[in-house]
């Protein structure tokens, strides 16, 4: 079945919109991660929590930041491929 002429353009626009949504999600995850990480570090210092809880907060923050980096890398690769006419 033949595709409508505007199908490729609408698909590219949909990909750009999806990329924009994902980048907003990445930005929110980074901002919330940093705020929570700083808050937990401060609260742990005030309440004299054991160091294991600080390390747990560090690992959770590292996990969120690695996820953000991977999603950003995927978006970058997808945009690079589409700008070179491969996607």
Swiss-Prot record:
What is the membrane topology noted in the UniProt record heading this document? Answer: Multi-pass membrane protein
Q: Where is the chain membrane-spanning?
A: 25-45, 53-73
What is the protein's major site of localization? Answer: membrane
Any one of the GO CC terms: plasma membrane
Is Cytoplasm among this UniProt entry's keywords?
A: no
Identify the domain of life.
Bacteria
Which key words are in the record?
Cell membrane, Membrane, Transmembrane, Transmembrane helix
Which organism does this record belong to?
A: Paracoccus denitrificans
- Localization of this protein: Cell membrane
What is the protein's name according to its record? Uncharacterized 9.3 kDa protein in nqo2 3'region
Q: What Pfam families does the entry give?
A: DUF5337 (PF17272)
């Amino acid at each position: 079945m033949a595709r409508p002429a505007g199908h490729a353009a609408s698909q590219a626009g949909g990909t750009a919109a999806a990329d924009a949504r994902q980048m907003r999600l990445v930005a929110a995850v980074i901002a919330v991660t940093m705020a929570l990480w700083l808050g937990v570090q401060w609260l742990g210092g005030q309440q004299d929590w054991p160091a294991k809880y600080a390390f747990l907060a560090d690992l959770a923050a590292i996990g969120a930041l690695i996820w953000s980096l991977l999603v950003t890398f995927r978006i970058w690769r997808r945009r690079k491929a589409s700008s070179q006419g491969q996607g």
